[in-house]
Swiss-Prot record:
One Gene Ontology molecular-function label: intramolecular oxidoreductase activity, interconverting aldoses and ketoses
Keyword Repeat recorded: no
EC numbers: 5.3.1.34
UniProt keywords, alphabetically: Carbohydrate metabolism, Isomerase
Gene this protein is translated from: derI2
Catalyzed chemical reaction(s): D-erythrulose 4-phosphate = D-erythrose 4-phosphate
Record-given protein name: D-erythrulose-4-phosphate isomerase 2
Pathway assignment: Carbohydrate metabolism; erythritol degradation; Carbohydrate metabolism; D-threitol degradation; Carbohydrate metabolism; L-threitol degradation
Naturally occurring in which organism (per UniProt): Mycolicibacterium smegmatis (strain ATCC 700084 / mc(2)155)
Disruption phenotype: Cells lacking this gene are totally unable to grow on L-threitol. Cells lacking both derI1 and derI2 are totally unable to grow on D-threitol or on erythritol.
Enzyme class: isomerase
Length: 152
């Protein structure tokens, strides 16, 4: 099943957001890409506004996953996690990206343009697209506990 992806970033993540958006649009595993990020490096829209807009689309079922880029990947993760039902993670290595989906069923991947090189970011997104959570896994009960606490 091809994924519907929403992508966003603030001005500190604009360049990577643009490069990764193009990569996503060219990937056969992606049905559509919606960009809710800033329009340029001079656009001062704050990262919480971008992150919440993307996360809300995932929470409403308008997108399967979101990719968020800011300077560190931390602020967008904090903001996205304020949206009920969203599990957003900051990950800058393959293992963490894998576990974010396989163990935590995270729908939102966050990265920092100032923290990770572009080629690694591209490789991580490519890996992320191929991962799918198994609702029968040992981790499913833990994810259900998170959802129950949140009331999602």
């Amino acid at each position: 099943m091809a994924l519907k992806i929403v992508i966003g970033g603030d001005n500190a993540g604009f360049n990577y957001k643009e490069a990764l958006r193009k990569d996503l649009e060219a990937d056969d595993r992606v049905a559509s890409v919606e960009d809710v990020g800033v329009g340029g490096v001079d656009d001062t829209t704050s990262y919480p506004n971008v992150a919440v807009a993307a996360a809300e689309k995932v929470a409403r079922g308008e997108a399967d996953r979101a990719l968020l880029i800011c300077g560190t990947g931390l602020g967008v993760a904090i903001a996205a996690n304020k949206v009920k039902g969203i599990r957003a993670v900051t990950a800058h290595d393959v293992y963490s990206v894998q576990r974010s989906v396989l163990s935590n069923n995270a729908q939102v991947l966050c990265m920092g343009e100032r923290v990770v090189g572009l080629e690694l970011a591209r490789a991580l997104v490519k890996e992320w697209l191929g991962l799918e959570f198994d609702p029968q896994s040992a981790s499913a009960a833990k994810v259900n506990d998170i959802c129950a606490y949140e009331g999602a």
